[in-house]
């Protein structure tokens, strides 16, 4: 078995106070010769409005085609949790998460959908990806319906 160089998996770890202090970790991809899609879903993501300090809520869907590295899922959970006390606009949170994953894991491709619940009566959906999906990659729909409220 490949030795893993991770600091959080299997340990009791307190979430970082901010995303900039959080540690996102990677592990070797044993299937790096295959192009495939991995998906993380965070249906209860929270952050703070940078102006009012009120909580914001989102359903995040992160799709990526790993290269040589995988995102270690406990570190991702802790990284996402670090946004709970972080004030940032929806667009910034969504793109920041995608860019951090790209920085650490260097995937073949990544897209993130941030489906934010309404604040001020307006739901905001934010989408970012690194470019076209690799040829032949099966990319299923993210499965999150547009916000309809009671309509």
Swiss-Prot record:
Pathway per the UniProt entry: tRNA modification; tRNA-queuosine biosynthesis
GO MF assignments: preQ1 synthase activity
EC number(s) given by UniProt: 1.7.1.13
One Pfam family from the record: QueF
KW GTP-binding (keyword) present: no
Keywords from the UniProt entry: Cytoplasm, NADP, Oxidoreductase, Queuosine biosynthesis
InterPro entries, per database record: GTP-CH-I_C/QueF (IPR043133), NADPH_dep_7-cyano-7-deazaG_red (IPR050084), QueF (IPR029500), QueF_type1 (IPR016856)
Keyword Zinc-finger: no
Catalytic site positions: 49 (thioimide intermediate), 56 (proton donor)
Catalytic reactions on record: 7-aminomethyl-7-carbaguanine + 2 NADP(+) = 7-cyano-7-deazaguanine + 2 NADPH + 3 H(+)
Subcellular location: Cytoplasm
Highest taxon of source: Bacteria
Positions of substrate binding: 71-73, 90-91
Biological process according to GO: queuosine biosynthetic process; tRNA modification
Family per record: Belongs to the GTP cyclohydrolase I family. QueF type 1 subfamily.
Name under which the protein is recorded: NADPH-dependent 7-cyano-7-deazaguanine reductase
């Amino acid at each position: 078995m490949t030795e893993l160089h991770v600091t959080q998996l299997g340990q009791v770890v307190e979430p970082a106070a901010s995303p900039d202090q959080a540690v996102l970790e990677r592990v070797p991809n044993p299937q790096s010769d295959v192009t495939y899609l991995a998906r993380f879903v965070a249906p209860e993501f929270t952050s703070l409005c940078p102006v009012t300090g009120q909580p914001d809520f989102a359903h995040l869907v992160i799709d990526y085609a790993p290269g040589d590295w995988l995102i270690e899922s406990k570190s991702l959970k802790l990284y996402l949790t670090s946004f709970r006390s972080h004030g940032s606009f929806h667009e910034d949170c969504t793109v920041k998460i995608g860019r951090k994953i790209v920085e650490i894991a260097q995937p073949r491709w990544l897209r993130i959908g941030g489906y934010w619940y309404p604040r001020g009566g307006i739901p905001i959906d934010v989408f970012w990806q690194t470019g076209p999906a690799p040829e032949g990659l099966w990319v299923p729909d993210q499965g999150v319906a547009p916000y309809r409220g009671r309509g």
